[in-house]
Amino acid sequence: MTNTKFVFVTGGVLSSVGKGIAAASMGMLFKARGYKVTAIKMDPYLNVDAGTMSPYQHGEVFVTEDGAETDLDLGHYERFLDENLSGKNNITSGKIYSQVITKERKGDYLGSTVQVIPHVTDAIKESILYGAQGADLAVVEIGGTVGDIESLPFLEAVRQLRRELGPNGSVVVHVTYVPILETTHEAKTKPTQHSVKELRSIGLQPDAIVLRSHTPLEKHVLEKTSLFCDVPLEGVINSYDVESVYDVPLLLEQEKLISVLEERLFGTTTEADLKKWKEMLSRQSERTLKVALVGKYVVLPDAYLSVIEAIRHAAMKLGVAAHVSLMSSDELEKCDDEQLSEKLSNMDALVVPGGFGARGIEGMVKVLRYARENKMPTLGLCLGMQVMSIEFARNVLGLKDANSTEFDPNTTYPVISLLPEQMQVRDLGGSMRLGAYPCTLVEGTRVHALYNKPVVFERHRHRFEFNNEFREAFENNGFQVSGLYEPKDLVEVLELKDHPFYVGVQYHPEFKSRPMVPHPLFLGLLSEAVAKASPVL
């Protein structure tokens, strides 16, 4: 079988209850005890991956080093564990069914009637074991809510796998929500009781329950949950709302959750080394920076989750607080110059993140012109870098029709155009330039100084690139190419001379930022903002 131990994390009562943060926190606390830890997210949707899903429904698509387009929870796992994960750490129903159907078409099942049990559940178990290879412990989060039809094959696979792993091979941690009535201020455990009943009916008994609530719960609520859900009192944990998601591991450690799980899995309890984590959280904020994030999908902040977290990481490192103002590029498109100045003049820095499609692009052009002309520290990511190029071509080079062929296929000045290998692509899923590629930095540039190394590996997710026909004109007018993918001579980084900080990158640096190791570009952006800003208490 395997020597890896498993923590299976299920969710009850409602979705978005915080399973991902709980799973990431547990993984981080086991790693702090010296274990080699990995994390796996199982998503019951029928999409093969998250790549073609709407950011309004699903939030951001997190891209791994190997180019997998995954659930945003993998971003939480990477940030908390400080480990690079891969496509094998995200299992979807679409991926599983695709594998099973492919095998059936090839005749691998030798004429068997292909069914959910055993064929689909076996494929799920194989994927879990493959994803956990080489780890002492794997935290496996089952997406959705117990009781969902889509989750049943995954929960059945977990039931079977637990049986095969033996009594000390795995634990189940059930994360539920405890509503508190406004009128009586009474915490209601009935939804949790029904959720556990549903979980038991599938054959899974939780070893621990994490009760999510807005405020701390009284002890009698935990005792009642313990009694009615048949979980030892020490295994019933209250995870109430805290100021930052990075406080959650300390809360779970305080509640001794990992001690309960470690004793069950490894027959021992050890101390966690949380010194550096606590030091990171203890830095005092002397001032608050206001950072404008101008994007297309700001209705759902999760669409820019990694960008927001990367800003926070840099802010913590610099000892400042960062207030991120989400601004819709659609709305800014309607503003005149005076209105635009009113919205942006009190901002200390600007980030324009990635996205797809023509909607809202002209709003970004307006914002970036303001930032360029008013010396506002600015970082453009992927689409943001492309719109920087469009704005510069129009307003500095005088190419009034300049555009990307994504937005205007017939533009006279295609400063951004389709990658040659993308010309014949028809399927959208998994067909972009994805994953980590080397970028060679030009010595003497701001970006080279920030990274302090000649070559960096950064993650990509795009089809369009800077058109080298315009490279000479850009550089002659002060927009310098400071990073290249040398094998194909692709422009990866642009930076504006004679500007405090105006940098555009074709990649997604936010995916590699970690709480204790902020990304150099976000550090550079906020450092410049700190230098320019007056203290705001």
From Swiss-Prot:
Short name of one Pfam family: CTP_synth_N
Key word Magnesium present: yes
Active site (record annotation): C382, H508, E510
Region (Amidoligase domain): 1-267
Gene Ontology CC annotations of this record: cytosol
Binding site for ATP: S16, V17, G18, K19, G20, I21, D73
Sequence positions that bind L-glutamine: Y56, G355, L383, G384, M385, Q386, E406, R463
Catalytic activity: UTP + L-glutamine + ATP + H2O = CTP + L-glutamate + ADP + phosphate + 2 H(+); L-glutamine + H2O = L-glutamate + NH4(+); UTP + NH4(+) + ATP = CTP + ADP + phosphate + 2 H(+)
Activity regulation note: Allosterically activated by GTP, when glutamine is the substrate; GTP has no effect on the reaction when ammonia is the substrate. The allosteric effector GTP functions by stabilizing the protein conformation that binds the tetrahedral intermediate(s) formed during glutamine hydrolysis. Inhibited by the product CTP, via allosteric rather than competitive inhibition.
CDD domains: CTPS_N, GATase1_CTP_Synthase
This enzyme's EC code(s): 6.3.4.2
Extra remark beyond the main annotation: CTPSs have evolved a hybrid strategy for distinguishing between UTP and CTP. The overlapping regions of the product feedback inhibitory and substrate sites recognize a common feature in both compounds, the triphosphate moiety. To differentiate isosteric substrate and product pyrimidine rings, an additional pocket far from the expected kinase/ligase catalytic site, specifically recognizes the cytosine and ribose portions of the product inhibitor.
Name assigned to this protein: CTP synthase
Source organism: Coprothermobacter proteolyticus (strain ATCC 35245 / DSM 5265 / OCM 4 / BT)
Lineage start: Bacteria, Pseudomonadati, Coprothermobacterota, Coprothermobacteria, Coprothermobacterales
GN (gene name): pyrG
